[in-house]
Regions:
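Beta-propeller-forming repeat regions
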Residues: 1-287
Length: 287
């Protein structure tokens, strides 16, 4: 039996990960987690949400972190942590930081990634459009967002594409960089590639435009993208043409990443995330 607080806590997706670092997986089905023995691990009371990410987002904090956004102000402001978008400790469900305090709206989208090489730890932002924040709780990183076609803010998924330690945004068949990067000769928020040029469609689901699938299939840490064709008759697999001087093991050898890629289209699509920390301040060029 569960207390009434556990009712209606599920999200439009769920994650399987070793939340409490005991060598066994737990089930995170939204605002609550079930331990490996079937018992209650924790419940935040935040209620239902659309976005749910689990990974290592804070370099010097032990364990994994969760970034999630929530639909129901009555829950996340009432019995929950009080923010529309939150960074949560995966071990106990405790609040690390958040934004959208006292929000009265459905926060339908959020994303987490290391997109700014000048800011330590990962960044996260949401459809509240209050800014790009640090997962560590150190506050606002920037009021400038990753933007795509037509200037819309990007919340879809993050991808290793350009061969850099930071990630780019993958949204509506486009890979877009955030900050100027002379190593790939691109400027702020410049489109790196549009897969539609080669015959793909813009993605699945007209409000999200997700790829069919993406991940590190070839084993060189840069990720490949699977898209349907514009005529819906073919499947395309795209691989980056950007060289890299950085080296990482095949990302799918990391259990957290492997689970995240396997579950990315179980419900609403969620991006891939590693279970160990890789950021611009830690990943060095190969000698």
């Amino acid at each position: 039996e569960h207390s009434s607080k556990w009712l209606s806590m599920c999200s439009h997706s769920f994650r399987v990960a070793d939340l409490d670092d005991d060598g066994k997986d737990e089930i995170l089905y939204g605002s609550a987690a079930i331990d490996d023995d079937g018992s209650e691990l924790w419940c935040t009371g935040n209620g239902h949400g659309d976005c749910l990410c689990v990974g290592k987002f804070i370099k010097d904090r032990s364990g994994l972190q969760i970034v999630a956004s929530f639909e129901e102000p009555g829950n996340y402001n009432g019995q929950g942590h009080g923010y529309g978008c939150q960074v949560i400790d995966a071990r106990d469900g405790g609040l690390i930081t958040g934004h959208g305090a006292g929000s009265t709206t459905d926060v339908g989208r959020c994303i987490v990634a290391d997109i700014d090489p000048d800011s330590p730890n990962f960044e996260y932002w949401s459809s509240l459009q209050e800014g790009v924040f640090s997962c560590s709780g150190s506050g606002l990183v920037s009021s400038t967002y990753p933007t795509g076609i037509g200037g819309g803010v990007l919340y879809n998924v993050a991808i290793y594409w350009s061969g850099q330690p930071t990630r780019e945004m993958l949204d509506r068949a486009c890979v877009v960089s955030y900050k100027e990067n002379p190593d790939v000769n691109k400027t702020n928020k410049t489109r790196l590639v549009y897969f539609g040029t080669y015959g793909s469609n813009d993605g699945n689901h007209s409000t999200k435009y997700n790829p069919c699938y993406y991940g590190d299939f070839l084993g060189d840490y840069r990720e490949e993208v699977i898209m349907g064709s514009s005529d819906m008759k073919s499947i395309y697999i795209f691989s980056t043409n950007h060289p890299t001087e950085f080296r990482l093991p095949h990302l799918m050898t990391d259990h957290n990443y492997d689970m995240s890629q396997a579950m990315q289209n179980m419900g609403y699509n969620q991006g891939t995330n590693l279970g160990y920390y890789v950021g611009a301040e830690t990943l060095k060029k190969a000698e």
